């Protein structure tokens, strides 16, 4: 069983306070979250927010986990082509600004998108940083399915659970609160494009209450493409509306 006390108190307090701003309570022992009845989300001052997930990687095609810098983060040919096609269709959205995350596969996705002349500037934002699986790189779901930390983070949805050098879901969501603060401060009334990871997309959906419960329709099998996903629609390099 995962012990939340292995995570520094300062980190747990930061996560708890940021999520509370969006009406989300965390059980301090189990790390589980839920919306607080009667609460609403703070005002979002931009006109719209969309997110493009990084291009498909070799890790995805091999059903392997990747960390921020592992060698399996290189893009597949299909991933590059899908992202280029999406980049060619961005004019219709009339974005004012693009914000992209700091890790190599996201930076490189941004480069693919900006290879085609766009009408917007792209700015790196450190807090647009999703799950980092350091310690689990190159492993499969089958390798990790009995790992207590993996069970806590991905199956029990414990917001504090992470590998010693990795990232928790709670920190990803807390970082997205800070990104929303940045958007409200600097991009009021603007159409904003984010370029980041699938976990960041889920974090924004949780904060902005796109489902009745934060983890409705989430499965670890779906998140990490467990089993034969040949015919499954993937959203790597594809745009999604957040707000």
Q: How would you label these PLM feature ranges?
A:
Residues 89, 112-116, 182, 186, ...:
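Active-site catalytic microenvironments for nucleophilic, acid-base chemistry
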Residues 100-101, 174, 195-196:
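Short beta-strand scaffold positions
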Residues 50, 123-126, 240:
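General small-molecule cofactor/ligand-binding pocket signal
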Residues 55, 198-199:
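Active-site metal-binding loops of divalent metal-dependent hydrolases
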Residues 1-47, 131-143, 185-190, 205-243:
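Acidic, low-complexity terminal tails and accessory targeting/binding regions
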Residues 59, 70-74, 115-175:
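Phosphate-handling substructures
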Residues 49, 190-198:
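Generic beta-sheet signal
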Residues 2-118, 167:
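Active-site-proximal alpha-helix that buttresses catalytic centers in soluble enzyme cores
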């Amino acid at each position: 069983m995962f012990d939340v006390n292995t995570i520094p108190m300062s980190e747990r307090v930061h996560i708890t306070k940021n999520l509370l701003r969006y009406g989300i309570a965390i059980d301090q022992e189990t790390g589980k979250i839920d919306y607080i009845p009667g609460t609403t989300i703070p005002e979002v001052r931009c006109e719209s927010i969309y997110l493009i997930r990084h291009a498909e990687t070799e890790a995805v095609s091999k059903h392997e986990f990747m960390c921020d810098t592992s060698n399996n983060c290189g893009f597949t040919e299909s991933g590059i082509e899908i992202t280029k096609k999406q980049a060619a269709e961005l004019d219709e959205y009339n974005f004012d600004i693009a914000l992209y995350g700091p890790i190599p596969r996201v930076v490189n996705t941004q480069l693919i998108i900006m290879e085609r002349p766009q009408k917007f500037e792209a700015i790196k934002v450190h807090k647009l940083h999703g799950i980092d699986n350091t310690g689990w790189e190159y492993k499969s779901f089958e390798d990790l399915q009995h790992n207590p930390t993996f069970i806590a983070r991905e199956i029990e949805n414990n917001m504090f659970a992470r590998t010693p050098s990795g990232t928790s879901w709670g920190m990803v969501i807390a970082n997205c609160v800070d990104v929303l603060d940045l958007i409200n401060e600097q991009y009021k009334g603007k159409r904003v494009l984010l370029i980041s990871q699938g976990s960041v997309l889920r974090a924004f959906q949780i904060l902005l209450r796109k489902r009745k419960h934060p983890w409705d329709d989430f499965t670890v099998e779906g998140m990490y493409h467990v089993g034969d996903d040949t015919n499954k629609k993937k959203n790597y390099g594809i745009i999604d509306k957040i707000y």
